[in-house]
Amino acid sequence: MVTVTRSPQEFIDQLRRTQSDLLARLEPDATLRPDDPKLDLKTLLKAALRNEMEAVEIAARWIPRTGDAELKLALARQVGDEARHYRLIQERLRELGESLAGFNPLAQGYSPLFQYLDGLTDPIEQVAAGQFTREAIALVKNTQFIAHCVALGDQKTAA
């Protein structure tokens, strides 16, 4: 028998602290700055397309795996949100003169994070890992990307 010694709020607070400590490792700007000079803004935006497509696909894969109607609807909303993000990035690339003809964001396969998330079967794990942790990682990286765009003088992409 497992004895619960923490309240739900204490668990959430501990999860947030642990997550914050781990995500702090992503914060140095050097983690965003490309080592390869070929990784310019357009290349970084194409990498963002991959991230958005993976977010679309993982949420879509989880819909038929859950029996909870509310979770199905939340995942469906997430699919739509991530698809909208994909379209916004796609449009910005076109404005920058980048042709996406023949571009496949998943041509190099799925990321290790996607593969891990795809293996989760428990809805609680999916929500914790997919919704909270993945979005927290995205928040850190998006903040860095915005700062990078501002430093390049590209206010439109930063917006």
Residue ranges and their predicted role:
Residues 1-159:
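Non-heme di-metal
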